[in-house]
Amino acid sequence: MPEEGSGCSVRRRPYGCVLRAALVPLVAGLVICLVVCIQRFAQAQQQLPLESLGWDVAELQLNHTGPQQDPRLYWQGGPALGRSFLHGPELDKGQLRIHRDGIYMVHIQVTLAICSSTTASRHHPTTLAVGICSPASRSISLLRLSFHQGCTIASQRLTPLARGDTLCTNLTGTLLPSRNTDETFFGVQWVRP
């Protein structure tokens, strides 16, 4: 008859089976908790508003122009208007007010209504200016553009803006801006502190 085993008995720890039986579900539970936490964190990040991520941004469309004596352009923004939005900055009587210090990209495009290259040169000088109009202590011109012989001008620049700065846009001359949102728009984007 063949011999079974070596004849030496190996003592097993009585809690070994219990330890194995408890360890497997514990590790599995930790892995499941980790996966669930990562998924919830990713969902929370996707649902954060742009302001909390550090993105102050606005894209505005022309609302209306003031009286003939007032060269100021008034803007509007919001999701009900289509591609127009405000995240961070706000509108104050049609002018854009900044809520966070930093370097911003300011951009604008204005197309003159009922314009051809010959009418643009006849009504020279028609000028568009963008500047900080309030507070008065920080009043400064940021962009000044002439239409010369064209009907559309567009420009952008990086500039430092401070909390409370209000940006104003002025159109001097006899021609009016187009209300078409593809032709006339104004916006800012926070770039860095």
Curated annotation (Swiss-Prot):
<dbReference type="GO" id="GO:0042102">
    <property type="term" value="P:positive regulation of T cell proliferation"/>
</dbReference>
<dbReference type="GO" id="GO:0005886">
    <property type="term" value="C:plasma membrane"/>
</dbReference>
<feature type="topological domain" description="Cytoplasmic">
    <location>
        <begin position="1"/>
        <end position="17"/>
    </location>
</feature>
<dbReference type="GO" id="GO:0033209">
    <property type="term" value="P:tumor necrosis factor-mediated signaling pathway"/>
</dbReference>
<dbReference type="GO" id="GO:0097191">
    <property type="term" value="P:extrinsic apoptotic signaling pathway"/>
</dbReference>
<dbReference type="GO" id="GO:0160162">
    <property type="term" value="P:CD27 signaling pathway"/>
</dbReference>
<comment type="similarity">
    <text>Belongs to the tumor necrosis factor family.</text>
</comment>
<feature type="topological domain" description="Extracellular">
    <location>
        <begin position="39"/>
        <end position="193"/>
    </location>
</feature>
<feature type="glycosylation site" description="N-linked (GlcNAc...) asparagine">
    <location>
        <position position="170"/>
    </location>
</feature>
<feature type="disulfide bond">
    <location>
        <begin position="115"/>
        <end position="151"/>
    </location>
</feature>
<dbReference type="GO" id="GO:0048018">
    <property type="term" value="F:receptor ligand activity"/>
</dbReference>
<keyword id="KW-0472">Membrane</keyword>
<keyword id="KW-0735">Signal-anchor</keyword>
<dbReference type="InterPro" id="IPR021184">
    <property type="entry name" value="TNF_CS"/>
</dbReference>
<dbReference type="GO" id="GO:0090717">
    <property type="term" value="P:adaptive immune memory response involving T cells and B cells"/>
</dbReference>
<feature type="domain" description="THD">
    <location>
        <begin position="56"/>
        <end position="191"/>
    </location>
</feature>
<dbReference type="InterPro" id="IPR008983">
    <property type="entry name" value="Tumour_necrosis_fac-like_dom"/>
</dbReference>
<feature type="disulfide bond">
    <location>
        <begin position="133"/>
        <end position="168"/>
    </location>
</feature>
<comment type="subunit">
    <text>Homotrimer.</text>
</comment>
<dbReference type="Pfam" id="PF00229">
    <property type="entry name" value="TNF"/>
</dbReference>
<dbReference type="InterPro" id="IPR042374">
    <property type="entry name" value="CD70"/>
</dbReference>
<comment type="function">
    <text>Expressed at the plasma membrane of B cells, it is the ligand of the CD27 receptor which is specifically expressed at the surface of T cells. The CD70-CD27 signaling pathway mediates antigen-specific T cell activation and expansion which in turn provides immune surveillance of B cells.</text>
</comment>
<dbReference type="GO" id="GO:0005164">
    <property type="term" value="F:tumor necrosis factor receptor binding"/>
</dbReference>
<keyword id="KW-1133">Transmembrane helix</keyword>
<keyword id="KW-1003">Cell membrane</keyword>
<protein>
    <recommendedName>
        <fullName>CD70 antigen</fullName>
    </recommendedName>
</protein>
<keyword id="KW-0225">Disease variant</keyword>
<dbReference type="GO" id="GO:0042110">
    <property type="term" value="P:T cell activation"/>
</dbReference>
<keyword id="KW-1015">Disulfide bond</keyword>
<feature type="transmembrane region" description="Helical; Signal-anchor for type II membrane protein">
    <location>
        <begin position="18"/>
        <end position="38"/>
    </location>
</feature>
<dbReference type="GO" id="GO:0042098">
    <property type="term" value="P:T cell proliferation"/>
</dbReference>
<keyword id="KW-0325">Glycoprotein</keyword>
<dbReference type="InterPro" id="IPR006052">
    <property type="entry name" value="TNF_dom"/>
</dbReference>
<feature type="glycosylation site" description="N-linked (GlcNAc...) asparagine">
    <location>
        <position position="63"/>
    </location>
</feature>
<dbReference type="GO" id="GO:0042100">
    <property type="term" value="P:B cell proliferation"/>
</dbReference>
<dbReference type="GO" id="GO:0070062">
    <property type="term" value="C:extracellular exosome"/>
</dbReference>
<keyword id="KW-0812">Transmembrane</keyword>
<dbReference type="GO" id="GO:0002456">
    <property type="term" value="P:T cell mediated immunity"/>
</dbReference>
<dbReference type="GO" id="GO:0019724">
    <property type="term" value="P:B cell mediated immunity"/>
</dbReference>
